[in-house]
Amino acid sequence: MGKGTPSFGKMNKNYTHIRCPRCGRHAYNVAKGYCAACGYGRSRRLRRYSWMNKKVNRIRIR
């Protein structure tokens, strides 16, 4: 098999994300070694932003 379009079909065989040890979500990137949801592996502090929560009546709820 060459290096063109047919080869790109073989790129989705392995796992990109597994279950995170800290938050339990399916967002731990095996190749990069950190969780996309909570930041485990990249930071000791929990990854948290204000835009993650939904606004109701212009007040951000948790």
From Swiss-Prot:
General function of this protein: Binds to the 23S rRNA.
Keywords assigned by UniProt, alphabetized: Metal-binding, Ribonucleoprotein, Ribosomal protein, RNA-binding, rRNA-binding, Zinc, Zinc-finger
Chain's gene name: rpl37e
Binding, Zn(2+): 20, 23, 35, 38
InterPro entries referenced in this protein's UniProt entry, alphabetically: Ribosomal_eL37, Ribosomal_eL37/eL43, Ribosomal_eL37_CS, Ribosomal_zn-bd
Annotated cofactor note: Binds 1 zinc ion per subunit.
Listed PROSITE patterns: RIBOSOMAL_L37E
NCBIfam families, alphabetized: PRK04179.1 (NF003214)
HAMAP family: Ribosomal_eL37
Organism: Hyperthermus butylicus (strain DSM 5456 / JCM 9403 / PLM1-5)
Swiss-Prot/TrEMBL cofactor(s): Zn(2+)
A GO CC term assigned to this protein in UniProt: cytosolic large ribosomal subunit
Top-rank lineage group of the source organism: Archaea
SUPFAM superfamilies: Zn-binding ribosomal proteins (SSF57829)
Family recorded in the similarity comment: Belongs to the eukaryotic ribosomal protein eL37 family.
Matches recorded under Pfam families: Ribosomal_L37e
Start-end of C4-type zinc fingers: 20-38
GO terms assigned for molecular function: rRNA binding; structural constituent of ribosome; zinc ion binding
Residues forming coiled coils: none
GO BP term (any one): translation
Name of protein: Large ribosomal subunit protein eL37
